[in-house]
Amino acid sequence: MRKFSLLIVLFSFTSFVFSQQNDVFRVVFWNLENFFDPFVDSTLTYNDYTPEGVQRWTISRFYKKRNNLYKTILSMSEGNPLSIIGLCEIENTFVTTMLFQETPLKRHNYRAIHYEGDDRRGIDVAIVYSVDKLQLVSSEVVKIRNPDNKYFKTRDILYAKFYDKKSDTLHCFVNHWPSRYGGERETVYLRKLAALSLKSKIDSLISVSAEIPKIIVMGDFNDTPYDKSIIDVMGAVPYDKSSKSDTL
């Protein structure tokens, strides 16, 4: 079995710090909880987050949320820009631009990776990275397919490949798997489908890597580390010092 290094971040808000000699490499994931712009999207039937919608989402409320978010990210940075920020529940590129380019976060030189997905509410995932710490090589979405329902739509998995300052390759996945809405048992197979899509992409990376690939998987999985999608499909096990390098 090919060996690889993999970190799985399973929480809705968490951060990890890696030491690279004198450099600090911080990885953060955050579910921004309905970070919508206040404008009507004519391509969607879901427009709750607009001034006339159910949530009465005005431009002033949008700016208030945006300001609270950037202040929190600044406080996490501690004067040293975060290396990678994984986000979910963002509506579009407009909201990431307003957060990272139209606030004091702009001086930290972040860039956002985002693709419009198929979620019925229009919420997506994004990867934000520091261009001073990482060079983007490529990015793409990993689609989650349901062989029993060709009309099935959900949020994509976002994948990005980076080079760090030492020209080492880093692979990053950001996930927001199908929710438990409708019942945990009734929806568990949907999260298994997401896990299968993720595992397939990881396996393909491992198969073509000459060296041990460095892989970060983060997101809101709507499951625990002990659920079937993580244990049975991903094959992940709880970490301890005796864990082998060829296990998740």
Task: Label every PLM stretch briefly.
Residues 43-46, 165-168, 172-190:
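Active-site His/acidic residue clusters
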Residues 17-103, 107, 113-123, 195-196:
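N-terminal, active-site-proximal structural segment of metallo-dependent hydrolase catalytic domains
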Residues 30, 88, 175, 219-220:
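Active-site flanking residues adjacent to catalytic metal/cofactor-binding acidic residues
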Residues 1-22:
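Bacterial Sec-dependent N-terminal signal peptides
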Residues 90-169, 177:
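Structured beta-strand-rich core segments of catalytic domains in phosphoester-bond hydrolases
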